[in-house]
Amino acid sequence: MEAKAILRTARISPQKARLVADQVRGLPAERAVNLLKFSDKKAAHLIKKVVESAIANAENNQGADVDELKVQTIMVDEGPTLKRFMARAKGRGTRILKRTSHITVVVGAAK
C-alpha cells in the first residue's frame, strides 16, 4: 500500500532541496515530519508539507495506519527555470537563473 504526493514548481533549487530530502529518505513518516519541523532550511518546510500530504492521502484514501508508514521514496527533480536579467556595467547584462523543483514523496507501510 503506497500513497503519493507531489509538489510541482517549488521555488527552490533542486540542489538545496536534495540536501534535506536525503535526511528523511527511509525514515518512519512521523519521525521524518518531526525532523523537518525543527530544521531551519526553507526546503524543510516545503518537504514537510509534501510528506504530511502523502500521509493524509494514505490515511484518507487507503485507510492506512499512520504509525506503520515510512517514507519509501523521495525525489527532487528539476522544474522549469525562470530566466531573469540583471543589468551590469557598460550596458551589458547577465542572465540570472531562478531554479524550481518538483518534489515527489511516496509513503508506504514498513515491511
Swiss-Prot record:
Residues forming coiled coils: none
Disulfide bonds: none
Family: Belongs to the universal ribosomal protein uL22 family.
Subunit annotation: Part of the 50S ribosomal subunit.
Name this polypeptide is given: Large ribosomal subunit protein uL22
PROSITE patterns: RIBOSOMAL_L22
GO cellular component, one term: cytosolic large ribosomal subunit
Keywords recorded for this protein, A-Z: Ribonucleoprotein, Ribosomal protein, RNA-binding, rRNA-binding
One GO biological process term: translation
GO MF term set: rRNA binding; structural constituent of ribosome
Membrane-spanning intervals of the chain: none
InterPro entries: Ribosomal_uL22, Ribosomal_uL22_bac/chlpt-type, Ribosomal_uL22_bac/org-type, Ribosomal_uL22_CS, Ribosomal_uL22_sf
UniProt-listed SUPFAM superfamilies: Ribosomal protein L22
Gene3D superfamilies for this protein: Ribosomal protein L22/L17
Domain of life, source organism: Bacteria
Function, in words: This protein binds specifically to 23S rRNA; its binding is stimulated by other ribosomal proteins, e.g. L4, L17, and L20. It is important during the early stages of 50S assembly. It makes multiple contacts with different domains of the 23S rRNA in the assembled 50S subunit and ribosome.
Family annotation (CDD domains): Ribosomal_L22
PANTHER family: CHLOROPLAST 50S RIBOSOMAL PROTEIN L22-RELATED (PTHR13501), LARGE RIBOSOMAL SUBUNIT PROTEIN UL22M (PTHR13501:SF8)
